[in-house]
Amino acid sequence: MSQVFDASAFLATCSGRPGVYRMFDGEARLLYVGKAKNLKKRLASYFRKTGLAPKTAALVARIAQVETTITANETEALLLEQNLIKEWRPPYNILLRDDKSYPYVFLSDGEFPRLGIHRGAKKAKGRYFGPYPSAGAIRESLSLLQKAFSVRQCEDSYYANRTRPCLQYQIKRCKGPCTDLVTAEEYAEDVRHSVMFLEGRSQQLGNELNAEMEKAAMALDFEKAAELRDQIALLRRVQDQQYIEGGSGDVDVIAAFVNPGGACVHLISVRGGRVLGSKNFFPQVGIEEEVAEVMAAFLSQYYLGNAERELPGELIVNVVHEDFNAITEALHTLRGRELTISHRVRGTRARWQQLAVTNAEQALNARLANRQHMAARFEALAEVLGLDEVPQRLECYDISHSSGEATVASCVVFGPEGPIKSDYRRFNIEDVTAGDDYAAMHQALTRRYGRIKDGEGKLPDVLLVDGGKGQLNMARDVMQELGFTDLTLLGVAKGVTRKAGFETLYLNDVHHEFTLKGDSSALHLIQQIRDEAHRFAITGHRARRGKARRVSSLEDVAGVGPKRRRDLLKHFGGLQELNRASIDEIAKAPGISKKLAESIYASLHSE
């Protein structure tokens, strides 16, 4: 079930400018992308009490979060909306056809190189393009390149072991170099075109493709001309969305916005005159911090604090600070690069500067509204639980498994400002009877609170457990064993109907049973934390289960240890391809004898 969305609190800070909005459910899955000439007016129409179409009502019932991006005009909103729909294919749209290092597009070496996403140190031989501000932005570029030029994006191990073309060939996203369906010369031309696009030379590329199209048409090769026409159309669409008129070079457009509740820095990345994407940062700030101080601190930490971060030639900012000269000099000394920090800009550059300011302000206002809303929920919870003070730290635990397989317990932490994700924890449960949720909860709580007793971590004000009477009794037993007898315990059980809003709650023991009204702010907080614990548990469980299933069939083979298992899976591109391999094919893998290959084959096909 999705957490309850407070539409009135959101709309109170929503902009009336043109833009794009994205609606998510309680598990952060994108439900719908839309555009609007007036974001506030359009979004308000979703939350009317009457007159909604059945499909719209079903969508609204699942909304847990709404995000917006302000654009300069409705046309830009339309272009961005279409790109997001193509990339994410949200279920409620009409469909016609995020401190990690920043990702790059990587082009490998070799006769038939691959394109892919790369993070971290640049150790592999090849070319790197970027950095991109987000994985979404980089996937958009890779998707466009795959549609236009069909350069492969599969892993080398998968590519090396293909005996027939894969689905990407069937849907015309790859030309099948793995099975010699394209010549090296033709493939090299596709790679060259891809590089031109990634280098920001789309205008030159478009002219070249247009000349080739006319040449193909003159030669009556209409199939080739149509293919080139489609490539040109794709390039024009991305140019309309991503290019700054009259712009060139590498630029970061940065705006800081501060009000009494916090600060936001919005960064727009432009490379080769092309907008790659944007990102919000929310630095911790003191009371009445000056916006120029926030900007200077951000530039110092963001650019000086990471030697691997690629520097643009120019930073466009919305405020000035006396430290800017020192920052540019330090960057020149440490990185050997000249960099200009610009404040007074004109034309299109001024327009993008203002858009960065607008997005920073909107993002901060939305964040602060959520904080205030969360604080009110904490106050309501304190009242219904009869606490003398508003709790400052809530922890919630949940268990996830598949018929006892790969059991994982989750711990999520919330404060009056929202989730404290740095304090989230997962526990891989071992040595308990399969499917015994009580034993799993006992192990997780004992491990967590045993560390707290030893001085590691903070004790919460309220401990929530999902599961009702049995899990509450288990939590109480553990707390008594460890001496935390004053900790407030809250059990959350689904009601008889098992519908959201009808939960049964137990305070400290199973005899203190009560329910809350469906519109209770305290209940909404409990639901939100419970659902977040469930989400965090199930994602951890799925990852653990997937990892176990990838290697379990090889674990009992004598002579195949962890390193050899990894090497085998890497060589074949995964367990599925290894399962398809014959004994002779397995024996060709590095370090695998014919006898060992027979043992591996027998283990994989034992059922």
Swiss-Prot record:
Keywords: Cytoplasm, DNA damage, DNA excision, DNA repair, Excision nuclease, SOS response
GO molecular function terms listed in the Swiss-Prot or TrEMBL record: DNA binding; excinuclease ABC activity
GIY-YIG domain: residues covered: 16-94
Residue ranges annotated for the UVR domain, each copy included: 203-238
A single cellular component GO annotation: excinuclease repair complex
Keyword DNA damage: yes
Domain of life of the organism encoding this protein: Bacteria
Subcellular location: Cytoplasm
Pfam families assigned: GIY-YIG, HHH_5, UVR, UvrC_RNaseH, UvrC_RNaseH_dom
GO biological process, one term: SOS response
Family: Belongs to the UvrC family.
Subunit structure, as described in the record: Interacts with UvrB in an incision complex.
Alphabetized HAMAP family for the sequence: UvrC
The protein's role, per its UniProt record: The UvrABC repair system catalyzes the recognition and processing of DNA lesions. UvrC both incises the 5' and 3' sides of the lesion. The N-terminal half is responsible for the 3' incision and the C-terminal half is responsible for the 5' incision.
Name of the protein in question: UvrABC system protein C
Organism taxonomic ancestry: Bacteria, Pseudomonadati, Pseudomonadota, Gammaproteobacteria, Pseudomonadales
